[in-house]
Amino acid sequence: MFKKIISFLTAIFISILGINALNNEMELLDGDFGYILDEAAQTAIIKTIYIPNNEKKDLVVPKYVSFHGNNHLVIGILENAIRSKVHRIKSFMAREDFINSARNFHSLTWLIIFNIPIISVSPAT
């Protein structure tokens, strides 16, 4: 019971981080990348992001959502995923150095809590 309460509170905390991230304008950067594989929810995961010239861009990608961006954008994407039926998310794929970075740990915590596999991919050379 205690473990479920901790898991629930952690999920709420991460959701708040994600909402804050999506409310701020974010610069898209090359480097970090990943996929949230979700055939059922499809485009429900991500709604709108901001690109550097203040133009809003809706991301519509059938069957999966891919992203390139900084840590805040990743948190926002994960927050949207947790709000759109977590049980449908099959796995999360990201670059090895992204997953191993201490600064990204809090954005991956809820994946661990919900036993969603995190797949590590070596960076392209």
Where in the sequence are the language-model features?
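N-terminal capping/linker segments that flank leucine-rich repeat
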Residues: 2-98, 106, 110-125
